[in-house]
Amino acid sequence: MIKAAEKASKSVIRDFGEVEKLQVSKKGPYDFVTKTDKNVEKILIEELSKSKKHYSFITEETGKINNKDKENFWIIDPIDGTTNFLHGIPHFAICIAHMSNNEIISGLIFDPIKDEMFFSEKNKGAYLNNQRLRVSKKNSTEDCLFSSNHEGAKFSDLNMRCSGCAALDLAYVASGRLDGFFHNKINIWDVRSEEHTSELQSPMYL
């Protein structure tokens, strides 16, 4: 899983450099980013299939891919935070999760720009680049910093931020950088790796 994300990240970083140049072009970066999304997904599927060739897939771009093993799934979001990527904002992540019999066994969130690998595995905890994660211990919401999507940011009495990348928001909750996360529209490929990382840390997220 980690090797797959690292290999795919090379393509992401290269294309992100090109996206920044396309911001001022007449054609714009939209088609280019769509191709990047699909290419990264293709790399992840190929790499993950090398170690577990019979596992099935649930992906953002392709949808469900059934293989011989229909109890084990790789869940993939090639680029979470696509809008950020599209506009040349360096805040997005590659997300992978392993689901077995409808239970998440492990999850990964990789920020290729900052080279931060958030990884969690059942009964083994959650880590950032091999360092054990610790959530915030704050008890008062007045001292907390939360993150949300636009439609969920209706809490005027809270310190709220909107980063544009749900995966990193939840990873930041798990690592104590953020104190909570609110999101009202999320798909299975958006949440499974992040959810697993965060659940292991028992954060406040709704």
Please describe what each predicted stretch is:
Residues M1-I79:
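N-terminal subdomain of lithium-sensitive/metallo-dependent phosphomonoesterases centered on the IMPase/IPPase/PAP
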Residues V12, D37, L48, T82, ...:
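Residue-level signal for inorganic ion chemistry
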Residues K38, E61, P78-G81, P112, ...:
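Generic detector of well-ordered alpha-helical packing
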Residues K68-Y127:
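DPxDG-like acidic metal-binding loop motif
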Residues L128-R132:
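A structural micro-motif at secondary-structure boundaries
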Residues R134-H196, S202:
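An extended, acidic
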